Every structure is written in structure tokens, then in C-alpha cells.
A protein has these predicted regions:
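ABC ATP-binding cassette signature C-motif
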Residues: 1-260, 309, 318-518
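Intracellular alpha-helical coupling/juxtamembrane segments of multi-pass membrane proteins
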Residues: 250-305
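Post-kinase regulatory C-tail/linker adjacent to protein kinase catalytic domains
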Residues: 313-315
């Protein structure tokens, strides 16, 4: 049974076409992976099917009485809301019924016999509905999911605006799972999640009986949980039955077949044109030449899509720093309360270190304390000599209305326009992306613009806070290669072992230093 039908969908932003005349269907129980490079339109597609965005052309049709739950990579939480309040809001329809039930109870004292009968009938109906939907176990359900995603230890009364990006993602995900929709729409749910909770989500989705559509660049995760792949590329959307690994094999074969057919056809076209040119003027061969020309005119010419630029990251190494890059002396990090025990850490030239641990444990706080961006609660951090620091921040707040070109030019005013465009193109951005405002780009494209700033300046130590979030497969591969080849030192926060294990030579586990209990 089809839950969702999308027919002849066309959409773009200005003169930038996203997809053209695409169709899509979602059947009951299908676990779909929606894949494609950054900027191909995956999140745009999700916004269209959820009604957040109207398409230029086409039809989106949901089955009747289908409840779809959407985890948006750009969703926000309002100040003043608590973790527990957000999670309980998953049950708002039931809570409203409870409120109506309480109103009825208040009205019973003043009701005449006829009103009493009507109110009692309504009261019974509401009580049956609440019992059917396990209303009286709401608190237990909230606690169960909060514990599974590590939210219980943060405190259900905590304001959501005090949370890190990863913690906010967990809150939104927990709320969505508590709603138990007929279909889950998940846009990069593993971004910011640590290994333990990615594993929990993987188990949850494997056991999930209903349908879901999942956008993710986490290939091991995709391979485990999906059974259908929809691939978005060159304004097209193509379906393949199987996991991502199977899709890659089929995609490579189809691409090779198309390229071979293109070469054969180009050879044939060349030979036909040559024959026509040599024989159209001669009376004896004119008819044969006209026949060949007709064949040319009727030929359905194969066109190969223009190759998208693949990112080629390369970090420039500056001057050689001193032996010690930084040393901490009884450093205690945190904001109102300590997040760490007194830390005595040191990093030497040549070290490449992964900083790991659960969300909210203080990894970003430690990085910012080392850089002096936030004050420590006590203790000191002493930076070494001749440091040229490159810092990639996990979250950049606020809307950036500058274009990509302006963004890079502000950072490197001596660059010519050609050099700016070339620098952005090397990061995998097309001309259309380069001329767009940063705020309209996908999360992955925005990350590439920020990486462009980093790779074009001399550094001898990189401090990177979750640089793989939002990046597509090609960009991740290129970034990993660039970090492996980088001659400087690296302190890297990353939740993907398959990324950092081949880059670093040491792992620092924050769980050994935290004051928090998880």
C-alpha cells in the first residue's frame, strides 16, 4: 500500500534547478535511504513532502489519516522550554483530552440529569481513548526514551537553550520517537550523536515496523537500517532496492554502461557525419548521404551529465612551532558548574589526537577553553610558541546573508575573483553555489565554505569540532585524506570512529575526566 505519492515534481531556487519532473513513492514498511551529494536537494525534498515548502510544479499526495513525524536538521527549540516539557509535548493531543476530562468533572456538579448523561458519555469516551493510548504511562515512556538517549542525566527540568547541538538533536529525536508517527522522516539524525546513542538509534530503526525516510551520509549506519535507496543527482531521483553498498555497485555498473554507450554513439555520429560530408555533393552517392543524414536527425543522442566538482582539501602547513603546543595546569572547564576535574594535559608537535566522549560531557568546552574563547573556572592553559591555529567550530549561529564569494573575499582580501572562485570550486562547490548566499546553502555546503577558509591559511595545528557533520561521502573521504597528509598537529572532536581511527595516533577519552555521571 502506498503511503506517499510524489508525481512530476519540479523545483528550484531562482535560476538554480534542484530537481526536474521527479516521481517518488513510499510503500508501507519501506525503510528508505535518501542519498546524494551536498546541495542536490535532499532536505528541500523533505521540506516539500512535509508541506513546509511549495514545489514549483508537481503533486504530493499522502494517504488519509497518516501521521508523519519529521526530524529537521535545522529545527530550533524556544527559550524557556525544558527537556521534559518538550518530550511531554509529544503527547499534546492526549493531554488536551485529559484537560477536557477535567473540565467535564468540574461541570458535573452543576449539570441537570440530561446534561449529566451527555457529559458522562463524553467522559467515558475520553477515558477509553486515554486508556487505549497508554496515557497513564506517559511519564514512564518519557523516562525510558530520555534514558536511552542520555537525556535523563542532563535533568528533565533543564532549559533546552542551555544544551549543546548534539543534546538538542537528541531532545527533538526523543520527542519524535515518543509521538510514534506512521512514518518517520529523519534528516541526518546521527549528526552530533555519540557512538552509544547512534547504536541505540540503529537498533530502534531495525525494529521499527512502520516506514521511514532517512537522509544520512553515515554509510555504515545506512547499510544497517535501510532496504531501499533513492539517489538524487543531476535533478533526477532514482530508486534501487537494497542497501547503500548494493546501490553503489549498481550505480557504478549503470554509469560504466552509459559511458560505453555514449562513446559508441559518438563514434557512430562521427562516422555518419564524415560520410555525409564526403558524399552529399556527388550525384551517385547523394541518396546514401541523405539516408545517413536522416539517421542522424532521428538519433536519440545520449548525453552525459556534467561531472560535479569533487572536493580536494589540502591544508597548508606554516612555520614549525615549538615542541609543546599547549599545557594545562589544573584546568577546570565549565560554565556555571565544573564539567571537568582539574586537568593537566599537554600536546606536543606532531601529535594527532581524537577527543571523544558522550554529548554534553565538555569536549567543545575544553576546546574553547584551550583557545581562550571562554574563561576556565580555575587553572590555566599555556599555549606554545609560534602557533598558527586553524579552528573549525561545530555550530555557527545567526543567518549569513553574504554570498560565498564575499565570505571568502572578506577573509582573503588580496585574492583575485578568479582565486576566490577557484578556492571554492576546490571544496566541491559549483558556480551556482558560489554565487548564492551562504544562508540558503545546505549544511554540507556551508561546512565546505568554512573549510575553504581553513585550507587557504597557513596553520601548524588544527582544532576541529565535528567537521564531518553534514559532509557528503566524497567530502568526508577528501577531508580524511587531507588530515592524514597534514604535516601539522590535530586535536579532533568526532563521533565517527571509521573517520578518525585512520587519522589520529592517540585518543583522549573525556569520560575519564568529567565530573558528570552518565
Amino acid at each position: 500500500m502506498s503511503i506517499l505519492n510524489v508525481e512530476h515534481l519540479t523545483h528550484g531556487f531562482g535560476d538554480r534547478a534542484i530537481f526536474s519532473d521527479v516521481s517518488f513513492r513510499l510503500l508501507k514498511g519501506e525503510h528508505i535511504g535518501l542519498v546524494g551529494a551536498n546541495g542536490e536537494g535532499k532536505s528541500t525534498f523533505m521540506n516539500i513532502v512535509t508541506g513546509k515548502l511549495m514545489p514549483d510544479e508537481g503533486k504530493v499526495e499522502w494517504s488519509k489519516n497518516v501521521h508523519a513525524g519529521y526530524l529537521d536538521q535545522h529545527a530550533v527549540l524556544e527559550k524557556g522550554m525544558t527537556i521534559g516539557g518538550v518530550l511531554k509535548s509529544a503527547f499534546d493531543p492526549l493531554l488536551q483530552k485529559e484537560q477536557r476530562m477535567n473540565e467535564i468533572c468540574d461541570q458535573l456538579g452543576d449539570a441537570d440529569p440530561e446534561q449529566m448523561e451527555q457529559l458522562m458519555e463524553e467522559l467515558g469516551t475520553i477515558q477509553d481513548e486515554l486508556t487505549l493510548h497508554d496515557f497513564y504511562t506517559i511519564d514512564a515512556k518519557v523516562e525510558e526514551v530520555a534514558r536511552a538517549l542520555g537525556l535523563l542525566d542532563l535533568g528533565l527540568e533543564r532549559d533546552v537553550t542551555d544544551l549543546s547541538g548534539g543534546q538538542r538533536t537528541k531532545v527533538l529525536l526523543a520527542k519524535l520517537l515518543l509521538e510514534k508517527p506512521d512514518i518517520l522522516l529523519l534528516d541526518e539524525p546521527t549528526n552530533y550523536l555519540d557512538e552509544e546513542h547512534i547504536a541505540w538509534l540503529k537498533r530502534y530503526l531495525l525494529d521499527y515496523e512502520n516506514a521511514f525516510i532517512l537522509i544520512s551520509h553515515d554509510i555504515p549506519f545506512l547499510n544497517e537500517v535501510v532496504n531501499i535507496i533513492y539517489h538524487m543527482e543531476n535533478q533526477e531521483l532514482n530508486r534501487d532496492v537494497g542497501d547503500y553498498e548494493h546501490f553503489q555497485e549498481v550505480y557504478a555498473v549503470k554509469k560504466a554502461q552509459l559511458e560505453a554507450a555514449y562513446r559508441r554513439q559518438q563514434q557512430e555520429i562521427s562516422e555518419l557525419k564524415d560520410f555525409v560530408a564526403r558524399n552529399k555533393a556527388r550525384v551517385s552517392t547523394r541518396n546514401m548521404a541523405m539516408s545517413r543524414q536522416k539517421k542522424l536527425d532521428k538519433m536519440d543522442v545520449i548525453e552525459l551529465a556534467a561531472e560535479k566538482p569533487k572536493p580536494e582539501f589540502h591544508f597548508r602547513y606554516g612555520k614549525t612551532p615549538g615542541k609543546f603546543l599547549f599545557e594545562t595546569h589544573d584546568l577546570v572547564t565549565g560554565y556555571d558548574e565544573p564539567l571537568s576535574k582539574p586537568l593537566n594535559l599537554s600536546m606536543e608537535r606532531g601529535q594527532k589526537i581524537a577527543l571523544v566522549g558522550t554529548n554534553g560531557i565538555g569536549k567543545t568546552t575544553l576546546l574553547k577553553s584551550i583557545l581562550g574563547l571562554i574563561p576556565s573556572l580555575s587553572g590555566t592553559c599555556e599555549l606554545g610558541e609560534n602557533l598558527e591555529i586553524g579552528y573549525f567550530e561545530q555550530e555557527v549561529k545567526g543567518e549569513n546573508r553574504t554570498t560565498c564569494i564575499e565570505e571568502i573575499w572578506q577573509e582573503f582580501p588580496s585574492f583575485t575573483q578568479y582565486e576566490v572562485r577557484s578556492a571554492l570550486a576546490k571544496c566541491g562547490l559549483t558556480t551556482k553555489h558560489i554565487e548564492s548566499q551562504v544562508r540558503v546553502l545546505s549544511g554540507g555546503e556551508q561546512a565546505k565554505v568554512r573549510l575553504c577558509k581553513l585550507i587557504n591559511r597557513d596553520t601548524n595545528i588544527l582544532l576541529l569540532d565535528e567537521p564531518t557533520n553534514h559532509l557528503d561521502v566524497d567530502a568526508k573521504d577528501s577531508l580524511k585524506k587531507a588530515l592524514q597528509e597534514y604535516r601539522g598537529s590535530i586535536l579532533l572532536i568526532c563521533h565517527e570512529p571509521e573517520f578518525y581511527q585512520d587519522v589520529v595516533n592517540e585518543v583522549w577519552d573525556m569520560s575519564k575526566w568529567t565530573t558528570k555521571v552518565f
